[in-house]
Amino acid sequence: EAESPYAHTKQMGEEVVKSFTKYTPDFKSVLLRYFNPAGAHPSAKIGELPLGPPTSLVPVITRTAAGLIPKMYVHGSDYETRDGSCIRDYIHVSDIADAHIKALDFVLKGKNLEACSLFNLGTGNGITVFEAIKSFEKVSGKKLNHEVGPKRIGDVIAIYANNDLARKELGWQPKYGLDDMMISAWKWQQTISTITAK
């Protein structure tokens, strides 16, 4: 069951693909469920550039470090988690790109026995908001201006992927950890800050 309107849109999209696949003979599909994409291409030539204020944690962190956001807020610190903040499964965008290549190969080589296959793309490890902040501070050497704010309505306490099927069927596994995500995201932020300052 979808926990938020955003999650509901993803669920509806999956249902459309499943329905189309069911009623279209010889059509095969693969659905990839991203958990929390983060990071940027290691070259810092490709990365996330949200229109308007970012809502994803990692761009909020990097923009705060760059001085574009004066202070970031951790939405709640009394959840039943190891440090009181929400837990998410962050997955590097390069790992997601790799999964797309493997999924395409899976379909083109006829490896998918079902008409519609679904794979979770995440590391399988949950990271708290405070752990993400600490990782960024460690790899960047910058102290983030942050404080605890109120909980947000609809925030799920903890969510992380079971990626066993993607590992088994696609031969995929994540290669990048949280520190890698933070390093590449910070490098990207520094690149776009330099470009936009000109």
State where each predicted segment sits.
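Catalytic helix-loop patch of NAD(P)-dependent Rossmann-fold dehydrogenases
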Residues: 1-36, 45-56
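A generic short-segment signal for beta-strand/edge and adjacent turn/coil regions
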Residues: 1-2, 30, 41-43, 89, ...
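Hydrophobic, Gly/Ser/Ala-rich alpha-helical and linker tracts in large acyl-processing enzymes
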Residues: 41-54, 61-64, 70
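C-terminal substrate-binding subdomain of Rossmann-fold SDR/epimerase-dehydratase oxidoreductases
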Residues: 58-198
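Active-site micro-motifs of SAM-dependent methyltransferase domains
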Residues: 36-39, 188
